[in-house]
Amino acid sequence: LMYACDGAPKDKLNVRLAALLHDIGKPQAKNIKTENGAELYTFYNHEQISEKISRPLLARLKFPNALIDNVCHLVKNHMFNYEPTWTDAAVRRFLVRTGYENFEDLIDLRLADIYGMHRIPMRLHDSPAGRLLLELKVRIEAEHEKNSALTLKALAVNGKDLMQAGIPAGKTVGKVLNYLLET
């Protein structure tokens, strides 16, 4: 954890705190399975556990609520695995889930995490993982430049429009809006 914190940008407290706390839930999430006689450790959903541990810890340390929310959001979303095969819609879904305003911090957190694993300072061009993050960054910027709707408010239609078109009020309206946002 400390190495990841060391790898985070010095001028971004939110990313440094997220780097410090992003794996704090691993001990609780640790699971051991045996394959071919070898023990393998897994940490499924450790990011969710880490987020739940981080929130009260940061509150107890009297950090501002906005910073706590941001750090916990980064911790909760740090386990993304971008693949070049992602469609534009998949990139938009990632942005909807994480927020355009957070993507650079998430990339910084991933680079810090890589540094924590390998103890080698990472920049976007330094490794295959870094180059994938750079490609994701380029694709995110392209989606943002297209003025893609990344929030429900940014859609050209709203719930009232859907109800006027004959969709009954209720959960269906929300499902349709979310579907439109994801496509």
Predicted regions and their residues:
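Charged substrate- and nucleic-acid-binding regions of tRNA-handling and nucleotidyl-transfer enzymes
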Residues: 54-60, 117-183
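Short, motif-level signal for alpha-helix interfacial/capping segments enriched in acidic residues
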Residues: 1-2, 136
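Divalent metal-dependent catalytic cores for phosphoryl transfer on phosphate-bearing substrates
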Residues: 2-128
